[in-house]
């Protein structure tokens, strides 16, 4: 069983502080954010990370039971590929069905307001779309604490780009990826693997420290 190192716990603490800062916002125009729930994989280091992060979040944020479908794994075969053993192919096929199941469980659009569903288009539709982009107390946020391969795959899937490209992306330990899904179905990636809250000295990826690797 892999658990967090002292550096990993420090990274998780800094991530919790950063999320708390984002949730509070700056003023009425930029925040606060309505975070509903924290979800986490069933792996020990993810559960430790979530525990440390949640110490900084409002008590109103729900904690769900760990979900093994969010556990780390090989989410799909990647392109460009390399020669793989039969066991690796089998693990990838198993990982794909599990991680895809988690993606479909958590990534979906909200129902559109009735006022927009009955709209006949034109300027009112444009105004509604513009209103969606503004800070709004009805916007709901979820935090998912999981793993690099899962995050990269789900980002590709959410953006509707080939998921086989997942290995071309890089998400550092305790980085933040921020996706928005509108009721209209539009999806935007506002942050991918952001580590500004960690600083160079505490930035790591898969055993590598810093950026010169």
Question: What residue spans do the PLM features occupy?
Answer:
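Phosphate-handling substructures
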Residues: 1-3, 51-137
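GST superfamily/GST-like fold recognition
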Residues: 148-152, 188
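Catalytic metal-binding/acid-base residues of hydrolase active sites
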Residues: 44, 70-71, 149
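Acidic, low-complexity terminal tails and accessory targeting/binding regions
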Residues: 21, 55, 59, 70-88, ...
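Internal, well-ordered alpha-helical segments in soluble enzyme and binding-protein domains
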Residues: 11, 46-49, 95-106, 150-151, ...
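Active-site-proximal alpha-helix that buttresses catalytic centers in soluble enzyme cores
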Residues: 1-66, 89, 173
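Generic beta-sheet signal
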Residues: 36, 138-149
